[in-house]
Every structure is written in structure tokens, then in C-alpha cells.
């Protein structure tokens, strides 16, 4: 089993989750997060529109601050090893614009999974 963690733009979460669901991966965990990459928090006019991001930039500029961290979303999904290329491919396809800020995907090993409700373990517990 592997955990696929994706850090993506907030405005692509719905499309990403829907695309994963369509191919049989409905179970995901999501969290709000903030970060920055090579662009170091600077925004470009050619980046896709992100909800409320312009307001955040304007407030930061008024106060003489630069944007240290950009709002992102973290999606985590645990899948069988054989499903990793499919899941990574879907996340990449939905989120790739070719611009800074498209995100990152990490693939980590999972030693064990336990479904608390039933006590099931291993691949049965992830239910994909």
C-alpha cells in the first residue's frame, strides 16, 4: 500500500476529487494548508484565479507585506501499489497548468491500515 499526498490549488479540489471518484477512488482525506515553492510566495497575473487570493494580496500590499505563504489544499489517499500510477496520473492531469503553483505529489509507503469500525486490516481496510 502507498499513500499519495497531493498539495494542490484550492480551486482544483472539486475537479480532482470528482476525477478520482469516477475511476473508483472515492475515499480521500483533505486539509487546508499554506506553503510556497520556487516562486517564494510571489504571484503572477498568469496564475489561475484562486478564491479570495486577490483580496489577500491587496491586504498584504496595503500593510507593506509580501505574501509569505500561499493557500493550498492537501489531499491524501491510500491505494494499492498497483494503483499509484493511475492516481498520480489523474491528479497530475487535473492540476497541471504549466505555471508555478501547480502543486506537488508525494508517494509514501504505508506499513499497515486498520479500519476502526470493523477491525479489518491491510488492503481490505482501505476499501478501494
Curated annotation (Swiss-Prot):
It comes from the Archaea. GO terms for molecular function: ATP binding; enzyme regulator activity. Keywords: Nitrogen fixation, Transcription, Transcription regulation. InterPro entries: N-reg_PII, N-reg_PII-like_a/b, N-reg_PII/ATP_PRibTrfase_C, N-reg_PII_CS. One of its GO terms (biological process) is regulation of nitrogen utilization. Gene3D superfamilies: 3.30.70.120. GO terms for cellular component: cytosol. SMART domains: P-II. SUPFAM superfamilies: GlnB-like. Belongs to the P(II) protein family. PANTHER family: NITROGEN REGULATORY PROTEIN P-II, NITROGEN REGULATORY PROTEIN P-II HOMOLOG. Could be involved in the regulation of nitrogen fixation. This is Nitrogen fixation nifHD region GlnB-like protein 2. It comes from Methanothermococcus thermolithotrophicus. The gene is glnBB.
